[in-house]
Amino acid sequence: MTIQAKPSSSISYDSTTYGTAPGLDIKEFQIIEDWNGRPASAWSVQRIGLLQSKIERYTYNIYHNNKYGKHNLSKLIPGHALIQFANETFGYDGWRMDVIDVEARECQPFTAVNNGENTNTSEVKYTVVAEAQVKVTLKDGTNTQCGGLGRITLSSRGECYNRSKKEAVGDALKKALLSFEKIILDYETKITNNYYVDGLYGSKKIKNEANTNYNLLSATNSKPTFIKLEDAKGTHIK
């Protein structure tokens, strides 16, 4: 038997019950809204749209120039251009980047032979590959995370490590800024399908109700404490 959900139906969290381990009080935890991959306000929707228009104007000639071929946009647009667009769009204090993790994954030494006119010399070089994970957060809480790679070949191992990590962070930052387009497209699709049950954006009223309008059940020494949110829909406790 196949059961299909009605297109107009939506998820409700009215009867959701939250629990904690013995010895913990649910009221000691803060209610936090995580806006990863979702716009937190109309401001971010408008600003991300403006950012995309700047990127499209910059890359129009790139995609219409056959010498570049079909490459990923993050490889064609320079990082300094994206940072400039972000500063112009969100404001210098309207966004920030946090490096979640950066690490050199492999280091491969090899011997490079230099063929001169009269002499043949060899030199040991190193190729280092690094990976980085960064998080870009707008001032209203909208955020996204992306990973990047860096690959550098030099004769100095220490310089290889430093530059490969820097390149990995720069690559991750570019991908994160470019990923805002996908966030908006996905957001518009979910609005069309009535995906959100907690409103289009966060609400201070909802968060205040979540802090006060809960019903604590009695707890024993061997059972965890439970809390039921009756009026606050779509609120997450972390």
Curated annotation (Swiss-Prot):
Gene3D superfamilies in the cross-refs:
DNA repair protein Rad52/59/22 (3.30.390.80)
Keywords attached to this entry: DNA damage, DNA recombination, DNA repair, Nucleus
Q: A Gene Ontology CC term for this entry?
A: nucleus
Tell me where it resides.
Nucleus
Against InterPro entries, the record matches this protein to: Rad52_fam, Rad52_Rad59_Rad22, Rad52_Rad59_Rad22_sf, Rad59
Superkingdom of the organism of origin: Eukaryota
Query: Some GO term, biological process aspect, for this entry: which one?
Result: DNA amplification
- Its main subcellular localisation, reduced to a broad class, is nucleus
Q: What does this protein do?
A: Involved in the repair of double-strand breaks in DNA during vegetative growth via recombination and single-strand annealing. Anneals complementary single-stranded DNA.
Further facts:
Present with 468 molecules/cell in log phase SD medium.
Please give the subunit comment from the record: Interacts with RAD51 and RAD52.
State the PANTHER family in the record: DNA REPAIR AND RECOMBINATION PROTEIN RAD52, RAD59, DNA REPAIR PROTEIN RAD59
Q: Which family does it belong to?
A: Belongs to the RAD52 family.
**Name the record gives this protein:** DNA repair protein RAD59
Q: What organism is this sequence from?
A: Saccharomyces cerevisiae (strain ATCC 204508 / S288c)
